[in-house]
Amino acid sequence: MKPSILEKLQQLGDRLEEVTHLLGQPEATSDMDNYRKLTREHAELTPVVEVFQNYRLAQSDLADAEEMLSDPEMKDFAAEEIEAAKAKIGELDTELQKLLLPKDADDDKNIFIEIRAGTGGDEAALFAGDLLRMYSRYAERNRWQVEIVSANESELGGYKEVIARIIGLGAYSRLKFESGGHRVQRVPATESQGRIHTSACTVAVMPEADELEDIELNPADLRIDTFRASGAGGQHINKTDSAVRITHLPTGMVVECQDGRSQHANKAQAMKVLAARLNDAQKREAQAKEAAERKSLIGSGDRSERIRTYNYPQGRVTDHRINLTLHKLDFVMDGDLAEITNALIAEHQAELLAAMGD
């Protein structure tokens, strides 16, 4: 391990002692904001320091075993101990490097997930509905909440566009690599000849901005229009102008919300979505620069990239970024995404570790 990393780990150990001491003071809870920050820092530092302590213990075991080599009667036992200690040190070294990887400040946040039907017309809209169900079922498995923010339904079912809010700790960390093009190959229900059609949807995953603090919205940059909410096919479902459309004039971004109970609720939700989109645009620009520098396949933020294919006749799902193919399409569409999300996170960590070693 590099001396600079060892020094950093020692500093983290010292800081954990300091934070533990501060939390133990009688006046610690007098400033609740500071208390929460210290508690969060303590929770982040503890696993790193514990692994580092195990690392130093393994190094001590190695040194003891090497000393035993000089004793002829202990030589074989010492050789086994040395091999075991070296293997343990290697494992802990890798674990420590992962723990020291820069944290994404957005990882613990709620998300907005935006699904848009692309090529394929009605079939693409139906697939957008399937994707929404897939992410909703995944959220249920993680005990997260799902709220529909805005939905533009198609006449045959499914959605031309739908925005959902997923509320739960770590939602962004698990789903941030879902952004991109999702392609489906299947025989549509309306296809009498049994021919396989290819359709596509675009998914955008955006962390929810913290109470509009992450991004500044100048009221002069916003045009806010109200209109009547409507259901599928355009039929009016209420007689008041409760739906809200917000246009961000500098970028041309438009957000519509009509699923709330009131104009006030729709406006508040639309502002949240707009803030998340603007925040996300800035984040993707930065990611694109970083990805270009390190030739990253994961987390480049490129929405035009086709990331995954769902092939129904073969019961197959393929993630093209990491060449992962799973023959369990039914399970995946029912929200069993853990194998895919874990593989994507592992690949992203490997890229970051490689960048650290450069």
Swiss-Prot record:
GO MF term set: translation release factor activity, codon specific
Main localization of the protein described in the UniProt heading: cytoplasm
Keyword Cell division set for record: no
PTM comment text: Methylated by PrmC. Methylation increases the termination efficiency of RF1.
Subcellular location: Cytoplasm
Protein biosynthesis is among the record's keywords: yes
SUPFAM superfamilies: Release factor
Coiled coil, from the record: none
InterPro entries (UniProt xref): PCRF, Pep_chain_release_fac_I, Pep_chain_release_fac_I_sf, Prokaryotic/Mito_RF, RF-1
Cellular component annotations (GO), alphabetically ordered: cytoplasm
List of residues that carry N5-methylglutamine: 235
UniProt keyword terms in alphabetical order: Cytoplasm, Methylation, Protein biosynthesis
Pfam family of the protein (one): RF-1
Disulfides per UniProt: none
NCBIfam families noted in UniProt: prfA, PRK00591.1
Family to which the UniProt record says this protein belongs: Belongs to the prokaryotic/mitochondrial release factor family.
Function of the protein: Peptide chain release factor 1 directs the termination of translation in response to the peptide chain termination codons UAG and UAA.
HAMAP family referenced in this protein's UniProt entry, alphabetically: Rel_fac_1
Protein name: Peptide chain release factor 1
Phylogenetic placement of the source organism: Bacteria, Pseudomonadati, Pseudomonadota, Betaproteobacteria, Neisseriales
Gene: prfA
